[in-house]
Amino acid sequence: AYLPDFSFFMDGGENAVAKSKESVEYSILGAADAVSKLSPDFIAFQEVDLDGTRSYHINQFELLQSEFTEYSSNYAVDYDSAFLAYPIFEPHGKNKACLATFSCFEMDSALRRSLPISTSFTKVLDLDRCYSIVRIPVENGKELCLYNVHLTAYGGNDEVRKGQLSMLYNDMETDYKAGNYVI
């Protein structure tokens, strides 16, 4: 939901909130347009705001649904911050975001899996990390398993990252060994 000149505070930049409500809508609709031109069977988005100070309280998931009306969709909340008071002069604020998965095939089920996160102070930047597994039935009786993943990007340590990758790998391997197709 950010324009190219946005410099995100977590990457050493200065911005925590989009420039305007219009810039959020422009960015989301632009991303949707770029993706739709590819005519994908599946789409996986991360950092999709359901509500948030940083995105002027625009429900980006609903905005994407309005652009991909022929797709079934699902979301899993992966960030729910009551209020992040940083940066001091333009706080990130209250935000709730998700992983959003879209499919041109009907989804049979979806599961949200919570990932291990840091227990240190950095966990305020890393709330609710997860992945979602969407299951789509296949004609041979197996399932196509779509994994939409958002691992720890900031804070944490190697042990947390290894734990996240191990959990993800184990779930993917279980699906694969069951004869399912894993993406």
Question: Regions from the language model: what does each represent?
Answer:
Residues 14-20, 48-52, 115-124, 150-159:
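Surface-exposed cleft-lining segments at the edges of enzyme active sites
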Residues 130-147, 159-183:
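His/acidic metal-ligating clusters that form di-metal
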Residues 96-99, 127-133:
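Short hydrophobic/aromatic beta-strand or adjacent loop that forms the aromatic wall/cage
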Residues 1, 46-48, 76-79, 105, ...:
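Active-site-proximal beta-strand/loop segments in catalytic clefts of secreted hydrolases
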Residues 65-69, 93-110, 137:
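Conserved beta strand-loop-helix elements of the APE1-like EEP
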Residues 83-85, 112-119:
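Short Pro/Gly-enriched beta-strand edge/turn motifs at strand-loop
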Residues 1-96, 142:
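N-terminal, active-site-proximal structural segment of metallo-dependent hydrolase catalytic domains
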